[in-house]
């Protein structure tokens, strides 16, 4: 007997609230933090999110009979209270994998964080976490190189990498920009970096910057005997211009380029990552605009989701905040999404904000980049928090040295090596940080001056987006 079509409107929970459902290994799972309008039951709010992010619409439609709606629909299978919040709750939703184009992060986000975020029944909605099934991960190319390959390319092992953003980030001519790059690299840094908003402005066209940077790197490598690099930002107004800049960096024999993945978009980022893999280029990723999306504790997308999506889309390095610097991010939350960038399997751990087990299979890892308001006094904590597979970037903490950028770079290099040596000797570098740094400063006038210069600089503000734990 054929199905009967009943026109009209019915409650979402009649179809999309399925508390008896057991998620499949192939399902894509999502955790949303929901705050509904007053008087709307939690089950109806959660079911509405499942419906509007999958197969649902506001009215029953006859064309539902032309497909197997029960197979394709998203299902809210669990609701949990948010600790310490009387209004919000977690909705756990399972989506069949066939709802998404293979390997397309753009398509996944269009469904999960599309029109549903403007739904009137919701006051706030936040995507807290996604469990990508291994079947989907295998369709994504991921990082173009990964941690091990990058270390081999740069010939750097056994410690975090050191970098800095060129300052002032806007206004320098190409030649003066190259001079600052040279000073930093000869002083001891591994990388220097374009800031996120340096593209091709009237004061410095991109070709000019690329050429002077390439010359600076060549001189610094000859002087130090080390492999050096600079993150050349190829983010552009069109994909064609982006690839033109990437090709020119390759012609100059540069090891690494950079992309602003949120403002540039996931489609552009995935394409650029594939280009980097095919052309032997490392890819540094900046997260400009992320806080607009992830900082509000009740609305938006948590950064752990953006970090997971970036690993799938492709990038070899990603900014993650610092814990100790000027940018938002507490220690446990930051460690949670650093794990998602680097590990092959990350277990559910609410104390770090991870709502699901996440199996990454054999996908390469991504370097976590600590950048934003850090200086030499932060070095012991940074080494302890981020470990070796990280890039520690000191912008003002390099250029602000009273003796200039080369001295600032030297101070950071000495501090880093002192902390790594102390850690390897079994010392508790966070507890013994002052002794370790002061001892190293006795043999490095650059470090001694840096320690004196920044001894009073702290960024002691409470975190806005805190973990929801009891």
Curated annotation (Swiss-Prot):
Localization per record: Carboxysome
Cofactor(s) this protein cannot do without: Mg(2+)
EC numbers, comma separated: 4.1.1.39
Listed PROSITE patterns: RUBISCO_LARGE
Predominant subcellular localization, coarse grouping: other
tRNA-binding recorded as keyword: no
Binding site for Mg(2+): 193, 195-196
Catalyzed reactions per annotation: 2 (2R)-3-phosphoglycerate + 2 H(+) = D-ribulose 1,5-bisphosphate + CO2 + H2O; D-ribulose 1,5-bisphosphate + O2 = 2-phosphoglycolate + (2R)-3-phosphoglycerate + 2 H(+)
Record keywords: Bacterial microcompartment, Calvin cycle, Carbon dioxide fixation, Carboxysome, Lyase, Magnesium, Metal-binding, Monooxygenase, Oxidoreductase, Photorespiration, Photosynthesis
Residues at the active site: 167 (proton acceptor), 286 (proton acceptor)
Cofactor note: Binds 1 Mg(2+) ion per subunit.
GO cellular component, one term: carboxysome
Domain of life from the UniProt record: Bacteria
Residues with site note (Transition state stabilizer): 326
Xref: PANTHER family: RIBULOSE BISPHOSPHATE CARBOXYLASE, RIBULOSE BISPHOSPHATE CARBOXYLASE LARGE CHAIN
The protein's name in its UniProt record: Ribulose bisphosphate carboxylase large chain
Organism: Synechococcus sp. (strain CC9902)
Species classification: Bacteria, Bacillati, Cyanobacteriota, Cyanophyceae, Synechococcales
Gene from which this protein is expressed: cbbL
């Amino acid at each position: 007997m054929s199905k009967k079509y009943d026109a009209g409107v019915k409650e979402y929970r009649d179809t999309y609230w399925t508390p008896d459902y057991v998620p499949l290994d192939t399902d894509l799972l999502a955790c949303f933090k929901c705050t509904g309008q007053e008087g709307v039951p939690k089950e109806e709010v959660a079911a509405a999110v499942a419906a509007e992010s999958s197969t649902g619409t506001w009215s029953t439609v006859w064309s539902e009979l032309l497909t197997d709606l029960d197979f394709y629909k998203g299902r809210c299978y669990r609701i949990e209270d948010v600790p310490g919040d009387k209004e919000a709750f977690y909705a756990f939703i399972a989506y069949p994998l066939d709802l998404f184009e293979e390997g397309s992060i753009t398509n996944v986000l269009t469904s999960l964080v599309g029109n549903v975020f403007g739904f009137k029944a919701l006051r706030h909605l936040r995507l807290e976490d996604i469990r990508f099934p291994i079947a989907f991960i295998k369709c994504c190319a991921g990082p173009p190189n990964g941690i091990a390959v990058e270390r081999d390319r740069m010939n750097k092992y056994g410690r975090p990498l050191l970098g800095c953003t060129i300052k002032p980030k806007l206004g320098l001519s190409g030649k003066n920009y190259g001079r600052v790059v040279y000073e930093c690299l000869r002083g001891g840094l591994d990388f220097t970096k374009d800031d996120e908003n340096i593209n091709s402005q009237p004061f410095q066209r991109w070709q000019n910057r690329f050429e002077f940077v390439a010359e600076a790197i060549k001189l610094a490598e000859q002087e130090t005997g080390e492999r050096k690099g600079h993150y050349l930002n190829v983010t552009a107004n069109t994909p064609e211009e982006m690839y033109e800049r990437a090709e020119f960096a390759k012609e100059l024999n540069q090891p690494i380029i950079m992309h602003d993945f949120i403002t540039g978009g996931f489609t552009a980022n995935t394409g650029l990552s594939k280009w980097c893999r095919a052309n032997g280029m490392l890819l540094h990723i900046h997260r400009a605009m992320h806080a607009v999306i992830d900082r509000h504790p009740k609305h938006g997308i948590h950064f752990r989701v953006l970090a997971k999506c970036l690993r799938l889309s492709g990038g070899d390095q990603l900014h993650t905040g610092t814990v100790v610097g000027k940018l938002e991010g507490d220690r446990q939350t930051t460690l949670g999404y650093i794990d998602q960038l680097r590990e092959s399997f990350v277990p559910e751990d609410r104390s770090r904000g991870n709502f699901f087990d996440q199996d990454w299979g054999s996908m390469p890892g991504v370097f976590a980049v600590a950048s934003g308001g850090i200086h030499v006094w932060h070095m012991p904590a940074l080494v302890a928090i981020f470990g070796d597979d990280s890039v520690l970037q000191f912008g003002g903490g390099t250029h602000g040295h009273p003796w200039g950028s080369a001295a600032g770079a030297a101070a950071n290099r000495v501090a880093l090596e002192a902390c790594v040596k102390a850690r390897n000797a079994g010392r508790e570098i966070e507890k013994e940080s002052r002794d370790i740094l002061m001892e190293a400063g006795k043999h490095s006038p650059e470090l001694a001056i840096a320690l004196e210069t920044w001894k009073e600089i702290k960024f002691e503000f409470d975190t806005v987006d805190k973990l929801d734990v009891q």
